[in-house]
A protein has these predicted regions:
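Conserved metal-binding segment of the jelly-roll/cupin
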Residues: 108-129
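Active-site region of the double-stranded beta-helix
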Residues: 2-108, 127-195
Length: 195
């Protein structure tokens, strides 16, 4: 599905809205503010699902690759993401009832590949390129509500993706070893599981 974004007004995530989740404390404490990524929500609706597009330009935030803020879905909502341009790293983490992270994995996805965000997992999307923008689309229920607070309270996800690789976020008490899962080579035909 090709959608012209030029005439649409995105929600813009600026640096000032990300300071609670960044690795680089110099950026956190600075007065700088600039655009990090653009969210075009509800560009299409089909079969009771909402289609969004997010554009994440290539940028380094100190030593950290640019990323989305990260959130959990309230209740058991799932979501499907597909990379339209560039490459993405999706970092997923699952909380136990006591708030500790009991599972963490990442998926690298290239143009045309998809991932499914499972129920009860929080997720962050990273653009791992210093030169290419990431453009991705997602299908989600319009009833899905999100919670950013666990990411804000812990200064980000349980891992940061830096120019030197993965680094554990020491604000979490226990961090499981990070594993890699594979991306889907297609978008699932039947998206009823998202409703």
């Amino acid at each position: 599905m090709e959608i012209n974004l030029d005439k649409l007004n995105p929600d813009i995530r600026k640096l000032s809205g990300m300071k609670e989740v960044l690795f680089d404390k110099n950026l956190v404490n600075s007065d700088q503010d600039f655009d990090l990524y653009y969210m075009y929500r509800g560009v299409e609706e089909k079969d009771g699902l909402r289609y969004d597009i997010t554009v994440v330009p290539a940028k380094m935030l100190g030593k950290e690759f640019v990323k989305t803020k990260g959130h959990y879905h309230l209740e058991n909502w799932q979501e499907v993401y597909t990379v339209l341009e560039g490459e993405a790293i999706y970092l997923m983490q699952k909380r136990a009832e006591n708030g500790e992270i009991n599972d963490a994995y990442f998926v690298k996805a290239n143009k045309g590949e998809s991932i499914i965000i499972p129920p009860l997992y929080g997720h962050v999307t990273i653009n791992p390129s210093k030169t290419e923008q990431l453009k991705m689309a997602n299908w989600v229920s319009p009833n899905c509500k999100v919670d950013y607070k666990p990411y804000e309270e812990n200064q980000g996800a349980c891992y940061y993706y830096l120019d030197s690789g993965w680094q554990k976020n020491e604000n979490y008490a226990n961090i499981p070893e990070l594993r890699q899962e594979m991306a889907l080579k297609f978008v699932p035909q039947n998206l009823d599981f998202l409703k």
